[in-house]
Structure formats: structure tokens, C-alpha cells
Amino acid sequence: MANKPVKKVVLAYSGGLDTSIILKWLQTEYGAEVVTFTADLGQGEEIEPARAKALAAGVKPENIFIEDVREEFVRDYVFPMFRANTVYEGQYLLGTSIARPLIAKKQIEIARKVGADAVSHGATGKGNDQVRFELGYYALEPDIHVIAPWREWDFKSREALLDFAEKHQIQIAKDKRGEAPFSVDANLLHSSSEGKVLEDPAVEAPEFVHMRTIAPEDAPDKPHIFTLDFERGDAVAIDGVAMSPATILTKLNELGHDNGVGRLDLVENRFVGMKSRGVYETPGGTILLAAHRGIESITLDRGSMHLKDELMPKYASLVYNGFWFSPEREMLQAAIDYSQAKVAGQVRVKLYKGNVSIIGRTSPYSLYDQDLVTFEEGKVAYDHRDAGGFIKLNALRLRVLAKRDKR
């Protein structure tokens, strides 16, 4: 139940059943004026219907905010994360995690604009998203009041939730009276499916779960080869055609979809302490990660590459756990961005039945010296005898240890 007076609240609103119920609950339980924010993150569905639904629920026209944030999402969140080659627990490309800070930021901006004293979200009390949203809110507006309905209301079952919806004339799709087969989240970077039929980690996910990719075995028998250009660590062109960040990711998603690239079935460790199984599709991101590592392989020196690889798991955990606006993430970002100054050039990519292969790399800043590495007689002076002293110095501690152990 409501325990603090709230005059105006900004709700992250999708227009779906759950956030429509939350909207009405905020009005009835808090007596608050509700402001809705709906973001177009490239989730692949129309967002304008959210306006009509909010109006039907009694939200004033001036309190309905709908914004296309796809370019900002990719430019300021996805690309910075990919400069770090960010992967959580060796597999997850953080498609859901990276979207939450942007939504939280927009809610706080709107709250300041309209004079709202609270913000609200539709994340459940078991998942990571509640943490991500709220850490974002507090980092940007430390005294904001946060309403998390799933942790507050008294509904004991889904039936009770649907009864509330019917009582308040909230439209319910016919299939909502039964259990939905799984829960879906989507944006321009990925789609995720969790829960219900996917909760048993021993059971293979049904094919219909996959929305962003065709099955690899159904992909074309001929590989697709293209080029991806980079500047300062960010992709800027496909096949020589310059594109905006969101357009590039959209095109990579299309290429990945058509070639069965980017499917992932994993069990991850949630920040809140439990394990969860998810089926993820990140076609464009999977291609982008492989290509970025490809261009880094010829433009970064060994020390920089290895340090980045050491820092990456920490960076990934910060993003996954909701600390995007933390000083430590910004410190890591500064180091990563510094490393990308000369990460520029072109990568040739081959897609074939779910696989991404890097088959060529060129850069004006390449550190690869063909004359130095050739097995033929090189033009660069390299005395093979020098390696003997190098090996002996590196072996010194091993020899000392071996002598001690033989005593």
C-alpha cells in the first residue's frame, strides 16, 4: 500500500498489460497524477498505441512522453560498451542491462521538466531490472521517491492482477487469461526470452522462441561476405557506405538474422542472488563484437589488449548490476576510450550458418609488420640468437624454484 504522499509520478510505460495495470494502480492507491514515458529502443513494435492507451487511462495529453531514442541508445550506450568487448560471464552481451540506464535517465529528465516527485517502473521484485532502474534514478536524482509496485501491492496471483484490470476496464488480450509461454524483452541490440517453458534448464528452447534469427541450419548454403569500417573503436560504415550508429546496428541485425547468427541459451547469475535461464538473440551485436576484436588485433599493442581483457569482466559486472552511472564505470570507460584512438580500419566478415569469421583486416595504424613475422628472409633486422638471452632471463625464477625443490 502507499506509504508516502506522491503528487506526480513518471512511469516507464510500455502500453502492455503490466504497466497499464501499474498506471491505474498508481492512480488509485497513491492518488497521484501519472506521467508516462515510452521509449522506442528498436524493440520492433509500434509505440504510438501507448499514447491512446494512456489517454484512455486518464493521463493528460501533456503528460504523455514518447521518444525515439534509438540513435542515442546505440551511440551513447551500446557502442561505448562494445569498445570494451563487454561480455558477462563469458557469453551474455548485456542487451537488457544496457537499455535500463537510458530509460532511467529519460524518466529523471522528464520528472525535472514536469515537477514530478516520484518515478516508477514495472520490474518485478525477483529480477535485476529493479536494481538497474533504481540505481540509475538515485545516481541522477538522489532524493527522488521510487515506487516499485511489484514490491508493494497486495496482489497474490496473476488472476488477482487480471481481476483488477477487468474492474478498471483495462483491455486484456484473450491469451492473457492463461499463462503466457515466456517473458520477452527486446531492443535494437537484442531480444531475450525467460520464464515459464524456459525455466527448466535441461529442456531445449522451442524454435518459436526465436524472433530475431532463423535457425542456422536453415540459413543460406552460400556465405555472406561484407566489410565493416571502424573509427576510434566504433563501426561507421558497411561495405563502404557510411551510416549512423542505429542504422549500422539495424543492418547488422538483418545480416545476422538471415545467416542464423547470434543465438544464445545460457544460465546466468543474477545480481539478486539466484540463477536464471535465458534465451538471447543478439545478431548484430555478435557480428560487431567479432569485428571489433578483429580490428583491435592489428591496432592495439599486446599490453593494451591484455589490460583491456583484464578490465572487461569488471566493466561487464558494473553494467549487468546497474552501475552505469558509477564513477568506477566512468573511470574504466575513460581508459577504454583512450585505447581506441587508433582502432580504425576495415574488417572483412564472413557469415555462414550461425558462424562469424573474420577473414581480413587492414588499418593505417596497423602494428602488424609482415616483414618482421615472415618465415622467409625478412627486411627487418631480427637476430634469432637474441631469443636465447630473452628465454634465459624469463626462465631464471623457474630454474631457481627447480633447484630448491631438488634439495
UniProtKB/Swiss-Prot annotation:
Per the record's keyword annotation, is Nucleotide-binding included, yes or no?
Answer: yes
Query: Which top-rank group of organisms is this from?
Result: Bacteria
**E.C. designation(s):** 6.3.4.5
Q: Does the keyword Amino-acid biosynthesis apply?
A: yes
Q: Where in the cell is it found?
A: Cytoplasm
Catalysis: reaction(s): L-citrulline + L-aspartate + ATP = 2-(N(omega)-L-arginino)succinate + AMP + diphosphate + H(+)
- Tell me which GO cellular component terms the UniProt record holds: cytoplasm
- Report the enzyme's class at the first EC level: ligase
Please list the residues that bind ATP: 12-20, 39, 122
- Give me the residues that bind L-citrulline, please: 92, 97, 128, 132, 183, 192, 268, 280
Q: What is its main location?
A: cytoplasm
UniProt keywords (A-Z) are:
Amino-acid biosynthesis, Arginine biosynthesis, ATP-binding, Cytoplasm, Ligase, Nucleotide-binding
Annotated positions binding L-aspartate: 124, 128-129
Q: Which Gene3D superfamilies match?
A: Argininosuccinate synthetase, chain A, domain 2, HUPs, Single helix bin
The record's family statement is: Belongs to the argininosuccinate synthase family. Type 1 subfamily.
Q: Which NCBIfam families match?
A: argG, PRK00509.1
Q: What name does this protein carry?
A: Argininosuccinate synthase
Q: Which species expresses this protein natively?
A: Caulobacter sp. (strain K31)
- Phylogenetic lineage: Bacteria, Pseudomonadati, Pseudomonadota, Alphaproteobacteria, Caulobacterales
